[in-house]
Amino acid sequence: MAVPKRRTSKTRKNKRRTHFKISVPGMTECPNCGEYKLSHRVCKNCGSYNGEEVAAK
């Protein structure tokens, strides 16, 4: 079995993980109330989706 000859340093480990990060979710402004919401989801503030009332407050 392959075993590393030397321990991986913190610097080398962190350099390898530079691209391993969480991306920011796509936020859009609600056309009804102007509150920020996730794309393709019902607005939590006013309950509208695609210009019509979907969820009651």
From Swiss-Prot:
One of its GO terms (cellular component) is large ribosomal subunit. PANTHER family: 50S RIBOSOMAL PROTEIN L32, LARGE RIBOSOMAL SUBUNIT PROTEIN BL32. Pfam families: Ribosomal_L32p (PF01783). Belongs to the bacterial ribosomal protein bL32 family. Keywords: Ribonucleoprotein, Ribosomal protein. InterPro entries: Ribosomal_bL32, Ribosomal_bL32_bact, Ribosomal_zn-bd. GO terms for molecular function: structural constituent of ribosome. Coiled coil: none annotated. This is Large ribosomal subunit protein bL32. HAMAP family: Ribosomal_bL32. The keyword Ribonucleoprotein applies. GO terms for biological process: translation.
